[in-house]
Amino acid sequence: MISFHEARSKMLEGIKPLPPEKCRLEDLLGRILAQDATASFDIPPRDNSAMDGFAVIASDVAGASEQSPVILQVIEDVPAGQVATKSLKPGQAIRIMTGAQIPANADSVIPVEETSAGISNTEVRILRAVRPGANVRRQGEDVTSGQLLIAKGTRLRPQEVGLIASLGLTEVLVSKQPVVGIISSGNEVAAPGQPLK
């Protein structure tokens, strides 16, 4: 009779990697990735707003405060997922939602909480100065195109499956799952529910 460890070593010596197979996103949990997962695009794909507010040129609001607000003309509203049709000029702002692309010439976003309404819907009072780049998520800030995200051989947990989904993939190659069986033998083996001798 051989020991468990020796038996295990002998068994592993004879095992070869199984070929890969395609697996759908919803079936990936717990599977072993058979390919490197690399980004084919930047995330975010372009500069976008990190919060609801107003896209501005930072130098326009350099001296803004609650005691001395800067009034800017609002020239457009840009919902999340949309792109501004106008470019900012000095003295202008564009109302922008979280996730919307940063308009041309804008270099920062003032959070809506740091503004107050102007005389009409076409102007806004800016109550605080911001530095260039404030509240802007830069293109590729999270992931850059070509970046290795998940290495081949990784067991896929929920966070890796979510990352694969964010890449727009609906299936990837995983290692084929082995079929495993256990055979118990011997005259001392008892069926489930039978008393042990």
Language-model features: where?
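Short, low-complexity N-terminal leaders and the immediately following helix N-cap/first helix
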Residues: 1-68, 95, 138
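Short, glycine/charged-enriched hinge/interface segments at domain edges or termini
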Residues: 55-197
